[in-house]
A protein has these predicted regions:
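Final/C-terminal transmembrane alpha-helix of multipass membrane proteins
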Residues: 226, 234-250
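Selective transmembrane-helix segments that form parts of the transport pathway or gating/packing helices
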Residues: 48, 52, 56, 95, ...
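Hydrophobic alpha-helical transmembrane segments of multi-pass membrane transport proteins
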Residues: 83-126, 211
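Short cytoplasmic-facing helical segments at TM-TM junctions of multi-pass membrane proteins
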Residues: 116-141, 222-226
């Protein structure tokens, strides 16, 4: 049995350290503006524009399902008009950022790991170093910056479409009064709720891009190595999102909500 199998905890902390170092190096590259704007635009198009269908479907059907489920419970206590306020707050604070990030991790994170993994296997990354070009500047920085820009916007889009779809279900399928639904939704939903979701999305964006790029740049040899790196990138990013969401929620609740 190999040493890596004997020390899974050590390997986990080593990977965490390597990912952290890559993230810090990439931040320095971004602030120093050592990336190419053309690469940034390409990544913005790939992450933001081409993820529209995934985000819209996720937000729309999540809003509809939550509205239909919450209505059953609220109807029992004669609080039908509060259905949409709960849906909106839940999406704004938690589900919007988490679900959108998980979908982007599966779609974009896998693609990033596969792209960089293929470049690693075909020795293109080594060629960049030979040409005195930093792989972090050329490959990682535009991907991380594009993710940091795109994911909060996609999350806001998912929250908005969930509100619209939930309202449509509440009004046209459940027969609720749109005026009361809207007034309750506006009253119980504040800017703090929206900011919580956007801050989480910003944090999750850094997690997805950094882990995906790290896994791709350190993949094994051959097609098997690329496939393994792609799978590990999605799994690691998804688990990290779910775990970090708990701690980020505690911190943001303390800073944004309990102080008000």
């Amino acid at each position: 049995m190999g040493r890596s199998a004997d020390n899974p905890l050590k390997d986990a902390f080593t990977s965490l350290g390597n990912v952290t170092v890559l993230f810090l190096d990439t931040l320095r590259s971004i602030f120093a503006k050592r990336f190419r704007v053309r690469d940034l635009v390409e990544q913005l198009h790939f992450i933001g524009v081409k993820s529209q269908s995934v985000v819209l479907l996720t937000g729309a059907f999540t809003g509809m399902v939550m509205c239909a489920q919450f209505y059953i419970q609220f109807h029992k206590v004669k609080m039908d008009s509060a259905v949409m306020s709960v849906v909106t707050v839940a999406m704004a604070r938690e589900l919007g950022a988490v679900l959108t990030s998980l979908m982007i991790a599966g779609r974009v994170g896998a693609a990033m790991a596969a792209q960089l993994g293929t470049m690693k296997v075909t020795e293109q990354i080594d060629a960049l170093r030979t040409l005195a070009t930093s792989p972090v500047d050329y490959l990682v920085a535009p991907r991380l910056l594009a993710m940091l820009i795109s994911l909060p916007l996609l999350t806001a889009e998912a929250i908005a479409i969930s509100m619209v779809s939930g309202m449509l279900v509440a009004v046209y399928l459940l027969g609720l009064d749109p005026v009361f639904l809207w007034s309750n939704m506006v009253f119980y939903t504040g800017s703090v709720d929206i900011w919580m979701g956007l801050i989480k999305a910003f944090i999750f964006a850094g997690i997805i891009a950094t882990i995906a790029c790290h896994k791709g740049m350190h993949c094994g040899q051959g097609a098997e190595g690329v496939g393994k790196a792609t799978t590990e990138a999605v799994v690691a990013a998804s688990i990290t999102i779910l775990v970090s969401n708990f701690f980020v929620t505690l911190i943001l609740n303390k800073l944004l909500i309990y102080q008000n």
